[in-house]
UniProtKB/Swiss-Prot annotation:
Entries under Gene3D superfamilies matching the protein: Ribonuclease Inhibitor
InterPro entries given in the database record: F-box-like_dom_sf, F-box_AtFBL13-like, F-box_dom, F-box_plant, LRR_dom_sf, LRR_FXL15/At3g58940/PEG3-like
Protein name as it appears in the record: Putative F-box protein At1g67390
Record organism: Arabidopsis thaliana
Listed Pfam families: F-box, LRR_At5g56370
Signal peptide positions on this chain: none
Domain named F-box: residues: 40-88
Length: 479
């Protein structure tokens, strides 16, 4: 099971939009009951845990419908680990949205109350008026205090104008020790009270959030255990500095236009991405993140939305929570980025696998890919070594296996610390040439080497130029 099941909830929905739980049945369904011949009903003979796995792949509404199949199925849905409610998918008559959506909201409350045991995750898409009538806060209370929900995603239908989606929650609303992941979308935050003492949160994603910069600073400071932080925010006051000081942070994404100043200090930050910013002064953007080896921040900010990822550093972690988040559907910003800079040791099979993951997740054409090669001379794990001996590592570069896949393309590729004598580095570069992965230009830095090494690398570059090119107009150059 993915570490981020809320993404799975989205992808497990049927291709058609489900009807509201209160929507009328079609004419051919009225008055009919679904009957199952007990002789042929082999599925019902399966144990509960298997049936729960089957229901977990359905939408919550479809899982609920199985309760009418037979007494055997009546309570099975109550054990599913994830719930997903979308009030926006229902069809409402004009002028009756509030009344009808409140009726659906009551049904949601009933479903949560009737569910047995704890929940791994829950997502709710609701209307703005649920923010002010106590319904949303009641859902959160039920999900955190009674269901011990670990993953919670709340999305509000955009209200009409400023201050229409205000979250006014009690202090410590999100501080339940079991709550580890929180996604909030389209809200106004007046205070940070709900985040008081949120040492429990490991992942926080704030999208379309409107608040004072000082409120954001308080929220971030109240969550010292964060490993993943995504900010897509707007503010009322621009002339204030956004401060992100966190020594546990692994992933940081910033999409906060018009802020006057950003101050980041994150000793363990491995993955940093940012959208366009236009600071009045270069000094208005300060980042202290020693693991990020590409540090031309001023030029990057003026260029394109980009990501900086130290794969070598992140691969040393026992749990790659940052990597898993970025390659999941929850990092919805990924494909909007235009440039990727990675640090990777291609002799390490785990790092190669992580490189493949991030490129596949991009799923399209990247404007620029920068690769800083590392040669750590650190032996792989026993599992990696055995797979390399058995040929698994070799298969990554075989012609029958496209790397990373058939869809990924990059217009311009830059290589730093390229060692021509390293067979794995040469194999990767040659695959990108022959597959047509690089569309316009491949740039290989040789100027930083000593004279004899420079000549050796330039000779290797000459070999790359002789390879059959997947793109005839590809230019391969040294710099």
């Amino acid at each position: 099971m993915s570490q981020f099941p809320l993404s799975i909830l989205k992808t497990s929905q049927p291709h058609h939009q489900p009807k509201s739980m209160n929507a009328p049945r079609s004419s051919d369904a009225r008055g009919k009951r679904i009957l199952i011949d007990p002789i042929d009903d082999r599925i019902s003979k399966l144990p509960d845990d298997v049936l729960v796995m089957i229901l977990a792949s359905l939408s919550t509404e479809d899982a609920l419908k199985t309760s009418v199949l037979s007494t055997r199925w009546k309570n099975v849905w109550k054990q599913v680990p994830y719930l997903h409610f979308d009030l926006l998918s229902a069809t409402y008559e004009s002028g009756l949205i509030a009344a009808l959506s409140n009726s659906v909201a009551e049904s949601i409350t009933q479903v949560i109350n009737n569910h047995n045991g704890h929940l791994m995750g829950c997502s709710i898409h609701h209307f703005a008026h649920h923010c002010v009538n106590g319904v949303l806060e009641n859902w959160i209370r039920l999900l955190t205090l009674e269901k011990n929900t670990r993953f919670l995603s709340l999305c509000n239908k955009l209200g009409k104008g400023r201050r229409t989606n205000v979250l006014r929650f009690s202090p410590n609303t999100f501080s339940h020790p079991k709550l580890a992941t929180l996604f909030l979308r389209r809200y106004d935050l007046v205070t940070a009270h709900a985040f008081k003492e949120c040492e429990n949160l490991k992942i926080l994603k704030l999208e379309g959030i409107l608040a004072e910069v000082d409120v954001f600073n308080t929220v971030i400071a109240s969550c010292p255990s964060l490993k993943v932080l995504v900010l897509n925010c707007m503010w009322y006051n621009e002339k204030t500095c956004l401060k992100i000081h966190n020594n546990n942070l692994k992933v940081l994404h910033l999409d906060c236009p018009h802020v006057d100043c950003i101050d980041v200090s994150a000793a363990l930050l491995d993955i940093f991405s940012i959208f366009y910013f236009a600071f009045a002064k270069e000094q208005n953007f300060v980042i202290k993140a020693p693991r990020l080896l590409f540090n031309n921040w001023t030029k990057d900010l003026e260029k394109v939305p980009n990501m900086n990822y130290n794969i070598t550093s992140h691969a040393q972690e026992k749990k790659n929570i940052g990597h898993e988040f970025v390659v999941s559907g929850d990092a919805s910003y990924l494909q909007k980025l235009k440039s990727l800079k990675v640090v990777v040791d291609v002799t390490n099979s785990r790092e190669v696998h992580m490189l493949r993951d991030i490129l596949v997740a991009w799923n399209g054409v990247l404007e620029e890919l920068h690769i800083l090669f590392k040669d750590n001379n650190v032996p792989n794990s026993k599992e990696d070594s055995e797979s390399s001996i058995g040929g698994t590592q070799k298969k990554k570069w075989e012609e029958a296996n496209l790397f990373p896949n058939a869809d990924f393309r990059v217009e311009v590729m830059w290589m730093f610390d390229f060692n021509g004598s390293n067979k794995k580095q040469f194999a990767l570069a040659s695959r990108f040439v022959t597959q047509g992965t690089v569309m316009k230009k491949m740039m290989i830095k040789t100027s930083s080497f000593f004279a004899n090494e420079k000549l050796d690398n330039e000779a290797v570059v000459a070999k790359l130029k002789e390879l059959p090119k997947g793109n005839e107009n590809l230019s391969i150059e040294c710099f």
